[in-house]
Amino acid sequence: MKTQIVILIVAVLFLQLVSQSDAFLKGIIDTVSKLFGKRGLKNLDQYNDLFDGEISDADIKYLQDLMR
């Protein structure tokens, strides 16, 4: 009976370790793929969308004040 409990505890700990490391590794892989992907190589400026013809200078100033 004691052996079964020990095996159960070890199995639960191992499954938790695998699930947590899977999420950690997925985060690292996603970050690396974003850095070296097609979109990651572009110069992504946060104000690129502000240079639309429909947005006035006052709107741009207001949005820049919000971003500060």
Curated annotation (Swiss-Prot):
Subcellular location: Secreted; Target cell membrane
Superkingdom of this protein's organism: Eukaryota
Primary location group: secreted
GO term, biological process aspect, one: defense response to bacterium
Propeptide: 40-68
Keywords on record: Amidation, Antibiotic, Antimicrobial, Cleavage on pair of basic residues, Cytolysis, Membrane, Secreted, Signal, Target cell membrane, Target membrane
Reported tissue expression: Expressed by the venom gland.
Modified residues (Phenylalanine amide): F36
Signal peptide residues on this chain, from the entry's feature table: 1-23
Record family assignment: Belongs to the non-disulfide-bridged peptide (NDBP) superfamily. Short antimicrobial peptide (group 4) family.
Identification of the protein by name: Amphipathic peptide CT2
Organism the protein comes from: Mesomexovis subcristatus (Scorpion)
Species classification: Eukaryota, Metazoa, Ecdysozoa, Arthropoda, Chelicerata
